[in-house]
């Protein structure tokens, strides 16, 4: 059967190399990460080219009317902040990949080893991977279409600026997609662990009803204890992957979340400006407006996918804790070693709760996400009020 999921993952890998985000090579057959000289030199060449393009853009005057045919001063400030933050996010992602290259290589190798251990995990996540891939592709094509729409207003400086802006967007989107795929992989493994825990508890429940106890009973208890210990070991590995992911993507995470925040406020303000002034007042064509709002839709769809997969992982972790609590319903005591194995994995989950943190500044939860949305709404209102008063 054709492995289209594996093909998509390899396309993402090579795309990451082409845009300069991945600076190592992967041996897919052996599940190894290789620091090949060819990959290093290619990444250096791409990164140097990016820096040259950015320096060329900074040294030249850029006409902000390529975004709106007629923009007031507040529009220009908003655009400058958005573009500057995107450039800073892209550069920080590239620099961080070199600074934490060894740690990232260990993380990828750890993920690949578990991935090859149970290849059907890939099939469990196939539709989520396809949706994320499709949203990313459509988003990139829409951004290219928006750039093509403004070709008649582009000089050389503006063309370089739009090209570098697109390149930085591609790097940021790819970094976010990599984070998404790792979390998705961990969540798929959690589904397997929950199934195994349920089976072990069910078999233990059946054993607890057996009396008198014989040698076969003790053998079965030892077998179940080994299974629980293996589950605990694998859960610890998965949590270690999430911890390493927090460390590797820390700086990128704060830049991306800052970008989502600023971009959401700016999007609300621009939508207000278009609703009040009309697209003709801003010298924006109907097709350009349709492309922009279509891109907004896919941009936020991607953000929602990223958020939901993290929140669902928290739910899976909590559900695993709840499943383990069912062992207290056994009708009689089990073997001491099996009881200790159950207690050990429960203590492991309680003592080391799952967290997805952004640079140790805040933890991603439903409450923190709701607070961020509330803050976005508040600051969007402030920006609109400022526009109403002074422009």
Swiss-Prot record:
InterPro entries: 7TM_chemorcpt. Its main location: membrane. It is a multi-pass membrane protein. Keywords: Cell membrane, Membrane, Receptor, Transducer, Transmembrane, Transmembrane helix. Residues 1-3, 60-73, 148-165, 269-290 are cytoplasmic. It is found in: Cell membrane. One of its GO terms (biological process) is monoatomic ion transmembrane transport. It comes from the Eukaryota. One of its GO terms (cellular component) is neuronal cell body. The chain crosses the membrane at residues 4-24, 39-59, 74-94, 127-147, 166-186, 248-268, 291-311. The keyword Signal does not apply. Residues 25-38, 95-126, 187-247, 312-391 are extracellular. GO terms for molecular function: ligand-gated monoatomic ion channel activity; taste receptor activity. Belongs to the insect chemoreceptor superfamily. Gustatory receptor (GR) family. Gr22e subfamily. Probable gustatory receptor which mediates acceptance or avoidance behavior, depending on its substrates. This is Putative gustatory receptor 36a. The gene is Gr36a.
